[in-house]
A protein has these predicted regions:
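Cysteine protease catalytic core and zymogen-processing segment of caspase-like enzymes
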Residues: 1-7
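Phosphate-binding and adjacent anionic-ligand microenvironments
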Residues: 7-175
């Protein structure tokens, strides 16, 4: 959508994603010369940042997409209509929907009694160790769930084994 909106001069500014947005998307948008900014996870934060930068396209990896041209909240029906409109123009779904290669991304959700466990020294050391191991070959995101008693660990890298290794280090410090 971002590329099509840019070509039609509908896109205002760029795209807002979240901390969970795949780096493959960010890289694709960069090659298309479309600005991309991240914000906290949640439609509320995406919408706030869209308003702050006067952007009209944003969304979450979960599929919640906000088309600011039409609505101020995510609307799956509206997104489906936009995709169908693009398909009507003669493109195949495979061409339209497979425009970038996502990096392998692994998400682990760990049930905890106390979400503040990630603030403990043992856990902080493990996070530092895992980030050092990642050493520019990917990224890690460790956060408390906003809705459940869980710690969410997301690892992203071209090297899946590296992701598993880093997540394991952090998981051991939490359990």
């Amino acid at each position: 959508l971002a590329r099509r909106w840019k070509m039609k001069k509908i896109l205002k500014g760029g795209v807002i994603g979240t901390l969970m947005s795949n780096y493959g998307l960010e890289n694709f948008l960069r090659t298309e010369k479309i600005k991309f900014f991240r914000t906290k996870v949640g439609d509320r934060y995406v919408k706030e940042k869209m308003k702050k930068f006067n952007f009209n396209l944003g969304g979450e990896q979960s599929g919640h997409i906000i088309l600011g041209k039409f609505a101020t909240t995510g609307d799956g029906l509206m997104v489906a209509l936009e995709v169908l409109f693009s398909l009507r123009k003669g493109k195949k779904a495979s061409q339209l929907l497979n425009v970038f290669k996502p990096l392998p991304q692994i998400l682990e959700n760990i049930m905890v009694k106390n979400k503040n466990v990630i603030n403990k020294t043992k856990c902080k050391k493990a996070i530092r160790k895992a980030n050092k191991l990642m050493n520019g070959y990917g990224r890690l995101l460790i956060r408390k769930s906003g809705t459940e008693p869980k710690i969410r660990i997301m690892g992203e890298s071209y090297d899946k084994n590296l992701i598993f290794k880093c997540i394991k280090i952090i998981k051991r410090s939490i359990k």
